[in-house]
């Protein structure tokens, strides 16, 4: 029997009606009320997520920048203290090790936030490529992460923070600020397509912070949210999920995150040659949006056809709570990736008609 890992918030899930599942070796809440209710709360008011299963790795030292430039695809030299950057790590063949966030806390002090299912793999990958005077330390067990997301997130969080949150712009953060007296790193980032904040604190402070935020946010409609809504929200916003839109067999260019790949930076990073070729001449496959015209919901790995030719497969799909449509993301042969191309998806041994549509499916009005 495999023992599932738990976050520091596990003991408070039941109080809020949390229903847990095995997610990549973690026992996490898939929902508290219903996925639809939680999804709509984030789109219209605010939702609070426990994302403490995510991994955190500290990179420090004189050679920390040179090291990061070698192992990630984005240009870390453009990052200023107090800034966050979305990036990827790739294998030499261009396949993706992981996608991640980098926070620059000091001139020689970076915090990397990596996917939960990849913590061990990523840490080993980073540690095995360390250069010079750079250190890599896995601090995942010491750090908890809460995400408060939605149009009312700022107002709710402001109740327990003395600093003016309006000063924290998108993809910026403040370190060591007090949230209801608890020291935390607060960043204006998220994985929902809405405005919001991610809060990093010590593991032992997480439960108190969770309870306080739900208490002060109750009148604005703040809801505890699980992984189910997190997935439908990120999917509508077309934010990739490692293991579905990204993998060791899928490059960042194919997955549509080429903006996080800077092949013109001086450093020779892993995968640079392949990614440069794909950026300049196009990748063989492309991640596209698809809308099912007939009955049926596209799910991960369902094959996509044109006639008798299999042109790719679905990476994620659902009945969109916001758009009320059956939509999916599919990685397909680039020849067929134009919007309005008619395709078929095999759903339970039956072909159903679908069409390529623009992405993102959902974009918030600013």
UniProtKB/Swiss-Prot annotation:
It holds the Pfam family GCV_T. One of its GO terms (cellular component) is glycine cleavage complex. It catalyses: N(6)-[(R)-S(8)-aminomethyldihydrolipoyl]-L-lysyl-[protein] + (6S)-5,6,7,8-tetrahydrofolate = N(6)-[(R)-dihydrolipoyl]-L-lysyl-[protein] + (6R)-5,10-methylene-5,6,7,8-tetrahydrofolate + NH4(+). It comes from the Bacteria. InterPro entries: GCS_T, GCS_T_bac, GCST_C, GCV_T_N, GcvT/YgfZ/DmdA, GcvT/YgfZ_C, TrmE/GcvT_dom1. GO terms for molecular function: aminomethyltransferase activity; transaminase activity. One of its GO terms (biological process) is glycine decarboxylation via glycine cleavage system. The glycine cleavage system catalyzes the degradation of glycine. The glycine cleavage system is composed of four proteins: P, T, L and H. PANTHER family: AMINOMETHYLTRANSFERASE, AMINOMETHYLTRANSFERASE, MITOCHONDRIAL. This is Aminomethyltransferase. It comes from Bacillus cereus (strain G9842). The gene is gcvT.
């Amino acid at each position: 029997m495999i023992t599932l890992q738990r976050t520091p918030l596990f003991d408070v899930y039941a109080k809020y009606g949390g229903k847990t599942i095995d997610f990549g070796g973690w026992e996490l809440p898939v929902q508290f009320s219903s996925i639809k209710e939680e999804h709509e709360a984030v789109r219209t008011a605010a939702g609070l997520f426990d994302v403490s299963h995510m991994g955190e790795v500290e990179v420090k030292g004189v050679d920390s920048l040179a090291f990061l430039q070698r192992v990630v695809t984005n240009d870390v030299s453009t990052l200023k203290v107090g800034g966050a950057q979305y990036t990827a790590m790739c294998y030499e063949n261009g396949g993706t090790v992981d996608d991640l966030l980098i926070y620059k806390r000091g001139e020689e002090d970076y915090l990397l936030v990596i996917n939960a299912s990849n913590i061990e793999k990523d840490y080993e990958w980073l540690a095995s490529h360390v250069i010079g005077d750079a250190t890599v330390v896995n601090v995942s067990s010491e750090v908890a992460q809460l995400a408060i997301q939605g149009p009312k997130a700022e107002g709710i969080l402001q109740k327990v923070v003395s600093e003016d949150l309006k000063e924290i712009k998108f993809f910026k953060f403040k370190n060591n600020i007090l949230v209801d007296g608890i020291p935390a790193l607060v960043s204006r980032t998220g994985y929902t397509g809405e405005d919001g904040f991610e809060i990093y604190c010590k593991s032992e402070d997480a439960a108190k912070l969770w309870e306080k935020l739900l208490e002060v946010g109750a009148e604005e409609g703040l809801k505890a949210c699980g992984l189910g809504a997190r997935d439908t929200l990120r999917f509508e916003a077309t934010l990739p999920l490692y293991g579905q839109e990204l993998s060791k067999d899928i490059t960042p260019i194919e997955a549509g995150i080429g903006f996080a790949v800077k092949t013109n930076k001086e450093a020779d990073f892993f995968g640079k040659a392949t990614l440069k070729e794909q950026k300049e001449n196009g990748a063989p496959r492309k991640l596209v949006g698809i809308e099912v015209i007939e009955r049926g919901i596209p799910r991960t790995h369902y094959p996509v056809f044109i006639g008798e030719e299999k042109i790719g497969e679905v990476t994620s799909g659902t009945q969109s709570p916001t758009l009320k449509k059956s939509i999916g993301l599919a990685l397909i042969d680039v020849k067929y990736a134009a919007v309005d191309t008619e395709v078929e998806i095999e759903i339970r041994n039956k072909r159903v008609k679908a069409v390529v549509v623009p992405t993102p499916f959902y974009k918030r009005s600013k």
